[in-house]
């Protein structure tokens, strides 16, 4: 007869944290959000840690190289999507690893034969007022000039005016050679009172820009997540089919950590993938696995050698696995169960395997709840898809700016490898949807606000570290009426004519 779990399966929204004693030391500035990313033995330090407990999901509409850089600057890690060619994913990893903080690859480029109307259209598209003029209009073409808002007046110039007639030519520009350090570049900017400094190589080709506005920004990133060579950390998703070809390419490109991207991780296919990596690379290549929702699934992957285990099936905002297949578990219940298994595994073996809560995060406080329930960090998709740095397009929907967001199990992603059980026959139904999410601006502003809430709540619980939160947190289940009571009610909000 089938096994029935006792008790109901709960979501994060059904729990609240009960405040605890806060000492005078419990202030947000004293809170550390550092947390382990990969397995380690008792008494040792993990090979990789996060400075903030947030990683981005392995999704086409979420984790590209721009977002990977932006998140690493805040202290987290992006897992670049694997639903692309091996060459493209490896190139994406290489771009993140070669990125120099403060050196920006130009995404606003034009040829001298273009017109003022082209400049205006490009500015509208990118939001940037500095446009590089290269011979072929590419980001790495031979630099021939620059156009800023000071080079033209729309009211006094014809739209068809060629760029070459009003650009600032190369001979009148101050540039710096490739190899210039960030400190040297900033000194040039301040000495010559520049807003931007183009970096060019020996052939006169554009390499990057250094902007005055980025100087202070760089100083404001104390949580940057860097490797031993001062490069940003980056992760990448792999599957259980072409790993023998994909993993070596990603390792050669410099990837720091891998994750097997699958909607269901309690399988022979994940075991074979991890075993192949261990036989080929030993412990030098870090790889997470999942997803699972119970203790048995966790122990299976931990015994296989997974460096961390992802928890969650069907809880993502665009995931419909529960609806189409009837499998899954409430995210809060799954996290609690798996984290208990992790602690038991640690007591038995002396090996700590971090747990990643993947899915089910609707509100910022759900992150704190997941951490309090035992998760070491959370994986977010919808949250990051809203930002400028995500790969998807920004669109206007009925007067509201939105970003496109689709699941890896959707027809659009065509990533059947994530949802296959390993046979040769492809699945014929979808486990994800294609959708929009409200545009929310820059990643940095939003992440800092979210983490400010996490730190504040931790102080309310009397905790200065994530481990301390897990030890001191007191949680209570709430009724549906309590959830309503917790929001605004019995007033008319100024942003609406409807009573709430």
Where are these regions (language model features)?
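Catalytic beta/alpha-barrel core
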Residues: 79-84, 108-110, 130-134, 175-177, ...
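Short beta-strand/loop segments at the ligand-binding rim of alpha/beta enzyme cores
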Residues: 47-56, 102-107, 227-236, 278-293, ...
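Terminal amphipathic helices with adjacent charged low-complexity linkers/tails
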Residues: 82-97, 140-153, 157-159, 189, ...
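Bateman/CBS regulatory modules and CBS-like beta-alpha motifs in cytosolic regions of diverse proteins
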Residues: 27-50, 57-59, 88-128, 133-136, ...
């Amino acid at each position: 007869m089938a096994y029935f779990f006792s008790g109901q399966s709960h979501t994060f929204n059904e729990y609240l944290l009960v405040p605890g004693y806060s000492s005078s030391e419990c202030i947000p500035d004293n809170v550390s959000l550092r947390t382990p990313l990969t397995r380690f033995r008792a008494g040792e330090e993990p090979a990789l840690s996060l400075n903030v407990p947030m990683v981005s999901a392995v999704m086409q509409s979420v984790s590209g190289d721009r977002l990977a850089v932006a998140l690493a600057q805040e202290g987290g890690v992006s897992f670049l999507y694997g639903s692309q060619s091996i060459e493209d994913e490896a190139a994406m990893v290489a771009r993140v690893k070669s990125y120099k903080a403060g050196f920006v690859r130009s995404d606003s480029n034009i040829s001298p034969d273009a017109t003022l109307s082209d400049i205006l259209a490009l500015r509208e598209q990118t939001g940037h007022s500095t446009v590089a003029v290269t011979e072929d209009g590419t980001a790495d073409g031979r630099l021939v000039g620059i156009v800023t808002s000071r080079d033209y007046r729309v009211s006094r110039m014809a739209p068809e005016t060629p760029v070459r007639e009003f650009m600032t030519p190369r001979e009148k520009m101050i540039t710096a050679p490739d190899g210039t350090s960030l400190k040297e570049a900033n000194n040039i900017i301040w000495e010559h009172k520049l807003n931007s400094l183009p970096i060019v190589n020996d052939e006169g080709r554009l390499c990057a820009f250094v902007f005055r506005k980025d100087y202070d920004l760089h100083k404001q990133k104390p949580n940057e997540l860097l490797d031993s060579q001062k490069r940003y950390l980056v992760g990448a998703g792999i599957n259980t089919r072409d790993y023998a070809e994909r993993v070596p390419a990603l390792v050669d490109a410099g990837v720091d950590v891998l994750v097997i991207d699958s909607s269901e991780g309690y399988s022979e296919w994940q075991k074979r993938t991890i075993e192949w990596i261990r036989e080929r690379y030993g412990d030098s290549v870090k790889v997470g696995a999942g997803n699972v929702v119970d203790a048995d699934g966790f122990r299976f992957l931990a015994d296989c050698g997974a460096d961390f285990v992802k928890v969650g099936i069907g809880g993502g905002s665009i995931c419909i696995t529960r609806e189409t297949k009837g499998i899954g578990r409430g995210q809060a219940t799954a996290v609690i169960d798996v984290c208990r298994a992790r602690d038991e595994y640690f007591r038995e073996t002396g090996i700590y395997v971090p747990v990643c809560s993947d899915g089910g995060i609707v509100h910022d406080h759900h992150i704190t709840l997941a951490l309090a329930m035992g998760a070491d960090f959370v994986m977010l998709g919808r949250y990051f898809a809203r930002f400028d740095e995500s790969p998807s397009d920004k669109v206007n929907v009925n007067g509201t700016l939105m970003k496109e967001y689709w699941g890896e199990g959707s027809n659009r992603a065509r990533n059947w490898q994530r949802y296959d059980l390993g046979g040769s026959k492809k699945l014929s139904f979808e486990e994800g949807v294609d959708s929009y999410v409200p545009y929310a601006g820059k990643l940095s502003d939003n992440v800092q606000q979210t983490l400010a809430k996490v730190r504040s709540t931790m102080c309310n619980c009397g905790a200065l570290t994530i481990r301390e939160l897990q030890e001191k947190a007191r949680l209570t289940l709430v009724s549906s009426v309590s959830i309503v009571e917790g929001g605004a009610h019995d007033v008319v909000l100024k942003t609406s004519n409807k009573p709430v």
